[in-house]
Regions:
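Conserved micro-motifs of the catalytic ATP-binding
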Residues: 65
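PDZ domains, with a preference for the canonical peptide-binding region formed by the helix
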Residues: 75-81
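DNA major-groove recognition helix of helix-turn-helix
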Residues: 62, 73
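Conserved hydrophobic/aromatic packing and binding residues within compact polymer-binding modules
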Residues: 37, 58-61
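Acidic, Ser/Thr/Pro/Gly-enriched interdomain connector segments
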Residues: 2-48
Length: 82
């Protein structure tokens, strides 16, 4: 997670963590997604818990990016985001 935070902060590609993030997920990778969404104009509490607000923000990002808006951060959404 530290590597991911460093690379995201410095505009470098962050590799997909290998697991989809969805409602109920938690941890540093969720926090990283929340921080990225906030940098794109969302106003999430970056607490590392993937709840309804994070899912809605992910769906908005997916729609803007031409992806299926399912609220899940899978590999395709991750690659567009990072």
């Amino acid at each position: 997670v530290l590597y991911a935070r460093y690379t995201a902060k410095h505009g470098l590609h962050v590799p997909y963590p290998g697991i989809a993030l969805r409602s109920g997920s938690s941890g540093g990778t969720v926090r990283l997604v929340q921080q990225k969404l906030n940098s794109l104009g969302e106003r999430l509490n970056a607490d590392g818990r993937f709840g309804a607000a994070t899912a809605a923000a992910v769906q908005r990002f997916q729609r803007r990016s031409g992806l299926t808006a399912d609220g899940v951060v899978g590999e395709e959404t991750w690659e567009k985001m990072f």
